[in-house]
Amino acid sequence: MHAGAFINFVWALSLVSLLAAVPPSPSFSLKNLPSTACRLPPAVSEKRCRTPDGSICSGRGSCDCGICLCEVKEAGKYYGPLCECHDWVCHTYDGQVCAGHGQCDCGVCKCDVGWSGEACQYPTTCDLTRKKSNEMCKNSQAVICSNAGTCQCGRCKCENSDNSGLIYGKYCECDDTECFDDETQEICGGHGKCYCGNCYCEAGWHGDKCEFQCDITPWEIKKRCTSPDGKICSNRGTCVCGECTCHDVDPTGDWGDIHGDTCECDERNCKSVYDRYSDDFCSGHGQCNCGRCDCKDGWTGRKCEHPRACALSIEESKKKCQGSASQPCSGRGKCECGQCTCFPPGDSKVYGKNCECDDRQCEDLEGKICGEHGTCSCGRCICEAGWFGKLCQHERKCNMTEEESKSQCESDDGILCSGKGSCHCGKCICSPQEWYVSGEFCECDDRDCDKHDGLICTGNGICNCGNCECWEGWNGNACEIWLGSEYP
């Protein structure tokens, strides 16, 4: 063996022997490694995370041993030592952060060359005449800067002498001082946020200033606010004590014409180019109905942007669509140049040259067709042998005595079928001569249901004892709002 190699071998052998002689320490384990727990007292940790206004991590994160761990939101992110910075913090003008003429740097707009102002909305040089400048500063009522600011080179500078920033908007139309609660002196009573003078309350609070606490269960609140597509307020509003408060303004400053019991209608879909200060719906050739354009005769397209060639006059077109019905397309479709497009588009349940057949009329409230005892033909049930009734819901054979049957047909007031029908095998058969009578005991009057275009529930739902139960794709008190896909 080489001398150098022999020396290394002897050294290694000695080291192994030395380590073997050391007794194992029973106390050595990962648990005995130095602790990573915070050594700061809780008070000191919180102090390091507290902002000058007293909030922990600006209310946008959690404090971990004196260090702020900022939350990450889908619409942007919080950052900074105290989570004080956010993509939304900077001022906006005309729907754009820093007016599109600068960069947002932790709540302050850094303006490009040639622009100034808290939102970089003012050009440093102006080549407009005073008349032209004032015209550009007028709101929809022709008032310059809503009498809440001054006009500078065609742009409004809102009066905020205390630098509160509570008056803002392209035309200084927003005044958040209206959100102050006179009693608590807090914005929205401390239970909501203010956008353009309107309070948007936190869950469990409601009122103009979020001053009232809700007294119904969370389950009932959610149920009332769930939109037809299963979302809370259609993701376009806030659920407040079972009622949807639709967002008129989103966090970027953009306005939305949003309405409906569950904020299901968004009128922005009716504008070819969205401008929150414009009323140019449906290209000027139609009416916006819950975010869908109903075009005037002679126009077509999702936003009525295309002229339609038709050789028929308006009256000739309607007459051709009406046929023998009382209304064009039987009130169940759209008439275009003498041809009916039935509601809902692509649904085979409504059909016919004039949309005269509506097989939805064969469904009961549980969705069964003709009570599963018959077939539907053009909206009328053809019952199997042994069954009868409008929806084939009555069996001809009966194993009850007459007394047993009558006892089940009496309402709480002791009257048989409310005096508006006959009793068969324990069930009321409402008088066919009085078409509007319905209900388990013939106690309901379908004439109480809301109408639209002269039709109960607009023909798009079932009247259930005074309330319209709308079919899929329809909404509104009279089922007059179509929420489904656009016409082909």
Curated annotation (Swiss-Prot):
Top-level taxon of the source organism: Eukaryota
X repeat residues: 449-488
Signal peptide: 1-21
Region span, Cysteine-rich tandem repeats: 49-488
Residue windows of the VI repeats: 270-320
Cysteine pairs bridged by disulfides in the record: 38-65, 49-63, 57-68, 70-83, 85-106, 90-104, 98-109, 111-120, 126-153, 137-151, 145-156, 158-172, 174-196, 179-194, 188-199, 201-210, 214-241, 225-239, 233-244, 246-263, 265-290, 270-288, 282-293, 295-304, 310-337, 321-335, 329-340, 342-355, 357-378, 362-376, 370-381, 383-392, 398-425, 409-423, 417-428, 430-442, 444-465, 449-463, 457-468, 470-479
Compartment(s): Secreted
IX repeat positions: 409-448
Carbohydrate-modified residues: 399
GO CC list: cell surface; extracellular region; focal adhesion; integrin complex
PROSITE patterns, per the entry: EGF_1, EGF_2, I_EGF_1, I_EGF_2
I repeats: 49-89
Ranges occupied by III repeats: 137-178
Ranges for domain I-EGF: 38-84, 85-121, 126-173, 174-211, 214-264, 265-305, 310-356, 357-393, 398-443, 444-480
Start and stop residues of the V repeats: 225-269
Renumbered ranges of II repeats: 90-136
Designated name of the protein: Integrin beta-like protein 1
Organism whose genome encodes this protein: Xenopus laevis (African clawed frog)
